Amino acid sequence: MIQPQTHLNVADNSGARKLMCIRIIGASNRRYAYIGDIVVAVIKEAVPNTPLERSEVIRAVIVRTCKELKRSNGIIIQYDDNAAVVIDQEGNPKGTRIFCAIARELRQFNFTKIVSLAPEIL
């Protein structure tokens, strides 16, 4: 479960390393974000000499959460950390590589470009 003020790792090579969630896109009173949800975040740590800089406000899609994800067939998926992929306004990733395994549920939310860049789909 991701809520405002939650710190996230970045799972791509866009130039950001750490993010902090400041808003969850969706209903006005939405409290938590899960895998596949879009959040507004601020960059807390960035790689030097990249287009993304510290304190820049961006959009990101959640790809890993510590909160377990339960599927209808009984499988439970749980990650060790919270992570996101930086996206643009159209929903395309800003990076060209993704470094972690991605849950199959992202395909249902029309993030097919992120799924195609992932090295493994769980």
UniProtKB/Swiss-Prot annotation:
Q: Which GO terms describe its molecular function?
A: large ribosomal subunit rRNA binding; structural constituent of ribosome
Q: Which superkingdom is the protein from? A: Eukaryota
Q: Name one GO biological process term.
A: translation
Q: Which UniProt keywords apply?
A: Chloroplast, Plastid, Ribonucleoprotein, Ribosomal protein, RNA-binding, rRNA-binding
Do the record's keywords include Chloroplast?
yes
Q: Which family does it belong to?
A: Belongs to the universal ribosomal protein uL14 family.
Task: Show the HAMAP family listed in the entry.
Answer: Ribosomal_uL14
Task: Describe the subunit structure.
Answer: Part of the 50S ribosomal subunit.
Mind telling me what this protein is named? Large ribosomal subunit protein uL14c
Which source organism?
Lotus japonicus
